[in-house]
Amino acid sequence: MPLSIIHFPHPTLRHVSRPIVRVDAKLKSMADEMLDLMYEFDGVGLAANQVDLPIRMFVANPTGKRDEGESWVILNPEIDRPKGNDTAQEGCLSVPGLYGQVKRPKTVRLRGFDLQGNEINQVLDGFMARVVQHEVDHLDGIMFFDRIGEEGLRDLEGHLEEFKTDYESKQGTGSIADEATLAQQRAEWEAMYTGGTTSNG
């Protein structure tokens, strides 16, 4: 079944993703699908849990264009060594149309691996640093509007309620599975790629 972008308040968006311990052809294919979706919807980054995969992987390209810049696929990312502060507008493909001003470190170090197992250890600044922090937040179950403060959140509350109503409607009609089924699906993905057991939700 092809991957698709899930929308708030789907529970996988709040799930803390586990590190990947296995890379196979299917995982590489899913990374390609994630890049396709990111470019299709004019994004600059997409985390695995945004396509209902509870694994620590994200894709990114700060240009948002397939034929420009570099397409990144990062496994098991970690960020540290934050420096400086910068505030800028962010949006999210899982809450399309919503934006907020988010304060983040201006410079961070990214560590992780690519699909070939090569280690990544790179200091990033500016927009790419912001993109990476946004995606790693996703993998930790954090969305950008969790970081915008009470005043900014008040501006979005009505729109977030609309997303909740739409989600509940789709779950009611069966186009989105119930919570128990979604938890089981996450556990199966974790067992396949993170060494988790199918008893974990």
UniProtKB/Swiss-Prot annotation:
Catalysed transformations (reactions): N-terminal N-formyl-L-methionyl-[peptide] + H2O = N-terminal L-methionyl-[peptide] + formate
Taxonomic placement: Bacteria, Pseudomonadati, Planctomycetota, Planctomycetia, Pirellulales
Protein family: Belongs to the polypeptide deformylase family.
Principal EC category: hydrolase
Gene it is expressed from: def
PANTHER family documented for this protein: PEPTIDE DEFORMYLASE (PTHR10458:SF22)
Species the sequence originates in: Rhodopirellula baltica (strain DSM 10527 / NCIMB 13988 / SH1)
One example of a Gene Ontology biological process annotation: translation
Gene Ontology molecular-function annotations: metal ion binding; peptide deformylase activity
Alphabetized InterPro entries for the sequence: Peptide_deformylase (IPR023635), Peptide_deformylase_sf (IPR036821)
Keywords for the protein's UniProt record, in alphabetical order: Hydrolase, Iron, Metal-binding, Protein biosynthesis
CDD domains assigned: Pep_deformylase
Function text: Removes the formyl group from the N-terminal Met of newly synthesized proteins. Requires at least a dipeptide for an efficient rate of reaction. N-terminal L-methionine is a prerequisite for activity but the enzyme has broad specificity at other positions.
Note on cofactor: Binds 1 Fe(2+) ion.
Named cofactor requirement(s): Fe(2+)
Protein name, per record: Peptide deformylase
HAMAP family reported in the protein's UniProt record: Pep_deformylase
EC nos: 3.5.1.88
Residues at the active site: E135
Binding-site residues for Fe cation, renumbered to this chain: C92, H134, H138
